[in-house]
Swiss-Prot record:
UniProt record, GO biological process: cell division; chromosome segregation; learning; long-term memory; long-term synaptic potentiation; mitotic cell cycle; modulation of chemical synaptic transmission; negative regulation of ERK1 and ERK2 cascade
Name used for this protein in its record: Regulator of G-protein signaling 14
Keyword terms: Cell cycle, Cell division, Cell membrane, Cell projection, Cytoplasm, Cytoskeleton, Developmental protein, GTPase activation, Membrane, Microtubule, Nucleus, Phosphoprotein, Repeat, Signal transduction inhibitor, Synapse
Function: Regulates G protein-coupled receptor signaling cascades. Inhibits signal transduction by increasing the GTPase activity of G protein alpha subunits, thereby driving them into their inactive GDP-bound form. Besides, modulates signal transduction via G protein alpha subunits by functioning as a GDP-dissociation inhibitor (GDI). Has GDI activity on G(i) alpha subunits GNAI1 and GNAI3, but not on GNAI2 and G(o)-alpha subunit GNAO1. Has GAP activity on GNAI0, GNAI2 and GNAI3. May act as a scaffold integrating G protein and Ras/Raf MAPkinase signaling pathways.
Main location: nucleus
Record-annotated RBD domain positions: 300-371, 373-443
Cell location: Nucleus; Nucleus, PML body; Cytoplasm; Membrane
The encoding gene: Rgs14
Stretches the record annotates as Disordered: 19-59, 191-220, 449-493
Organism the protein comes from: Rattus norvegicus
């Protein structure tokens, strides 16, 4: 006789969202002892991840979703993860990681075995002709010469990159894959897990058997027969697990920030975050619980890459600006929001406007770039400007735009701090003067050259007129040459330059006199047609 329909949901606390918050930590002193054995990535030194109210012996499959490190510590979980990577044609990543783990356990004194294993790992995964090459950055490439002096930790950097790639990219897809959902369902029903690579979970009869229900009965909400769902529709099965979690557990788990450094080829799966948000919202609507729905409804998230290389998740809540959304993250990380530029990943040409609504960044990735600001006091112009530049720029590069605006060059100015005579080297990085005030002085010869420079249009317009009035110009003396004819001294003659300036001013004045004539007080007489009748010459007052 069929009994009541069995609820297949996992009890509260047994399902943790697949957002790992484990942190790659260095090995402690006790772990690093003993002939260079062990590594910060050793499976014995991996962080345990978030604690669970249920032991891993009771619920081993559910514990796989708590952290990537806990998955690697379970041999069966590692086997299922390897099978998943085979379907994605990236099983060489976990194979390389396991090979590095075994390599680090070789004593440093056993140079023969180290050399043999290092040769095998290099030619199988890292060389240009490798049979199963792994995806690592150019900075982590190794040449074959390093095999001459093998060390237990010689592949640590490459192993770290592959570890981050699996943790932040492959692991997020594994915990929401149909393969993992089948394992969760089998564990919830008490069925034994199938061996990785086989076609069915447990007994084929139990795996394919459709639940028989009494008339008028139905399966619990969110639970359907897995075999009848297409591949893309297999995900709603997770809705039954999330339904029984406390209301704040979903939000708190989603707010966890990843503490490990991100590899350039690894990224957080934002599609999974959007799926969690949409499924949670639709599930609450189906339950018909209207109380507090607007307050507890989770929104979509934005992945924020920080300047130090780490990543964080920000809730794109409607009604908030991008500035408000990032204020909490910047305050927590000790960043000054006015000194931050925000760029969309892949579109770094133009920074985002922080006053627009943050919902435009839902399911998007943004990158924060820090800017160094300092105050620059222009003595000659009596102005104070605020300059913002990248930390990697030098002072001469940051000052170039303001100097070009005022027609100056780097050899015409000096930079120093207020009240100090010691000059600031323009080759220093901008980060060395962060939040400081600098004074920009111009050299005396720079001021002279700026005052003596005459626009070509003015000089060309007045020179032809002065050719007809040579009597007004004093003869040019031989002392007006800027440099000596022999070129031995090469020094500028300041007095001759001043004489040239006075001469050019007189040339301009002569040109104006030739055109308009000298304006005197006697010449300022109104024409007759503009004068009043009483002011006209020869006019008489009419008799009364």
């Amino acid at each position: 006789m069929p009994g009541k329909p069995k609820h297949l949901g996992v009890p509260n606390g047994r399902m943790v969202l697949a957002v790992s918050d484990g942190e790659l930590t260095s090995t402690s002193g006790s772990q690093a002892q003993g002939e260079g054995r062990g590594s910060s990535l050793s499976i014995h030194s991996l962080p345990s991840g978030p604690s669970s109210p249920f032991s891993t012996d009771e619920q081993p499959v559910a514990s796989w979703a708590q952290s990537f490190e806990r998955l690697l510590q379970d041999p069966r979980g590692l086997a299922y993860f390897t099978e998943f990577l085979k379907k994605e044609f990236s099983a060489e990543n976990v194979t390389f990681w396991q090979a590095c783990e075994r390599f680090q356990q070789i004593p440093a004194s056993d140079t023969k075995q180290l050399a043999q294993e290092a040769h095998n790992i290099y030619h199988e995964f890292l060389s240009s002709q490798a049979l199963s090459p792994v995806n690592i950055d150019r900075q982590a490439w190794l040449s074959e010469e390093v095999l001459a002096q093998p060390r237990p930790d010689m592949f640590r950097a490459q192993q770290l990159q592959i570890f981050n790639l699996m943790k932040f990219d492959s692991y997020a897809r594994f915990v929401k894959s149909p393969l993992y959902q089948e394992c969760l369902l089998a564990e919830a029903e008490g069925r034994p897990l199938r061996e990785p690579g086989s076609s069915h979970l447990g007994s084929p009869d139990t795996a394919r058997k459709k639940p028989k229900l009494k008339p008028g009965k139905s399966l619990p909400l969110g639970v359907e027969e897995l075999g009848q769902l297409p591949l893309a529709e297999g995900r709603p099965l997770r809705k039954s697990f999330r339904r029984e979690m406390p209301g704040g557990a979903v939000n708190s788990a989603l707010r966890r920030e990843s503490q490990g450094s991100l590899n350039s080829s690894a990224s957080l799966d934002l599609g999974f975050l959007a799926f969690v948000s949409s499924k949670s919202e639709s599930h609450r609507k189906s339950l018909g619980s209207g109380e507090g729905e607007s307050e507890s409804r989770p929104g979509k998230y934005c992945c924020v890459y920080l300047p130090d290389g780490t990543a964080s998740l920000a809730l794109a809540r409607p009604g908030l600006t991008i500035r408000d959304m990032l204020a909490g993250i910047c305050e927590k990380r000790g960043l000054s929001l006015p000194d931050i530029k925000v760029y969309l990943v892949g579109k770094e040409q133009k920074a985002l406007v922080l006053d627009q609504d943050c919902t435009v960044l839902a399911d998007q990735e943004v990158r924060l770039e820090n800017r160094i600001t300092f105050q620059l006091e222009l003595v000659g112009l009596e102005r104070v400007v605020r300059i913002s530049a990248k930390p990697t720029k030098r002072l001469q590069e940051a000052l170039q735009p303001i100097l070009a605006k005022h027609g100056l060059s780097l050899d015409q100015v000096v930079l120093h701090r207020p009240g100090e005579k010691q000059l600031v080297d323009l080759e220093n990085l901008v980060s060395s003067v962060a939040s400081q005030t600098l004074v920009l002085d111009t050299l005396p010869d720079a001021k002279t050259r700026e005052a003596s420079s005459i626009p070509p249009c003015r000089s060309q317009g007045c020179l032809p007129r002065t050719q007809t009035k040579d009597s007004h110009l004093p003869p040019l003396s031989s002392s007006l040459s800027v440099e000596d004819a022999s070129g031995s001294t090469g020094k500028r003659q300041t007095c001759d330059i001043e004489g040239l300036v006075e001469l050019l001013n007189r040339v301009q004045s002569s040109g104006a006199h030739d055109q308009r004539g000298l304006l005197r007080k006697e010449d300022l007489v109104l024409p007759e047609f503009l004068q009043l009748p009483s002011q006209r010459p020869g006019s008489q007052e009419a008799p009364p």
